[in-house]
Amino acid sequence: MYHLGDEYSQKAKREGYLARSVYKLIEINEKFSLFSSGNVLDIGASPGSFSQYAYKKLKRGVLVSVDINDISLRYVNNFYFIKGDIFSDDTASKINKFGPYSLVISDVAPKTTGNRLVDTSNSFNLNMRIIDLSFEVLLKKGNLLVKVFQGGDEMQIFKKFEKYFKFVKKIRPKAVRKNSFEIYFLGKSFGK
């Protein structure tokens, strides 16, 4: 989604990315070195900018992108797209088929209602599913990055990260819009 006047949207368009959100991932990766050898899972991949960047950073292994909506990316080698709902057993089974993963990234957000309490609750439930699914497919020492909405039960998510990862960090990248209440939680070195 490109919005005139937004520097990150204009930059994304110039550089061929599908969405401005890619600069959040780029900034986080430059600071915390998310990518290593191994498979990468992008949950909530639409419109596809996180997957575009992840594909460029892929060292060995495959990129698996999952979303309930189609994405326009079509790479020939080492790329698989799964159209499905992460709450479905069938989708989880397909994700498992390509694992394990050294990195799971998620920029997914629930459909927003405008009611912050409802939106943060929906974000929490979505992220708990992403985390549970990630714990099934992450390699020991793997990394997990998720977007969460502030103002609800997000600290429960952070505590779960602290329990299972050696390094955890709350991050608000510069590309996050000023009026947004989103932040990212990063967990590195799964399984302590």
UniProtKB/Swiss-Prot annotation:
Catalytic activity: uridine(2552) in 23S rRNA + S-adenosyl-L-methionine = 2'-O-methyluridine(2552) in 23S rRNA + S-adenosyl-L-homocysteine + H(+)
InterPro entries linked: RNA_methyltr_RlmE (IPR050082), RNA_MeTrfase_FtsJ_dom (IPR002877), rRNA-MeTfrase_E (IPR015507), SAM-dependent_MTases_sf (IPR029063)
Active site: 147
Region forming the signal peptide: none
Main localization (coarse): cytoplasm
Residues the record lists as binding S-adenosyl-L-methionine: 48, 50, 67, 85, 107
UniProt GO cellular component terms: cytoplasm
Gene Ontology terms, MF aspect: rRNA (uridine-2'-O-)-methyltransferase activity
Enzyme class: transferase
Entry EC number(s): 2.1.1.166
Transmembrane portions of the chain: none
Pfam family, one: FtsJ
Keywords, comma-separated and alphabetical: Cytoplasm, Methyltransferase, rRNA processing, S-adenosyl-L-methionine, Transferase
Subcellular location: Cytoplasm
Cysteine disulfide partners in this protein: none
Role noted for this protein: Specifically methylates the uridine in position 2552 of 23S rRNA at the 2'-O position of the ribose in the fully assembled 50S ribosomal subunit.
Family membership: Belongs to the class I-like SAM-binding methyltransferase superfamily. RNA methyltransferase RlmE family.
HAMAP family according to UniProt: RNA_methyltr_E
Name of the molecule in the record: Ribosomal RNA large subunit methyltransferase E
The species this protein was found in: Borrelia garinii subsp. bavariensis (strain ATCC BAA-2496 / DSM 23469 / PBi) (Borreliella bavariensis)
Protein encoded by which gene: rlmE
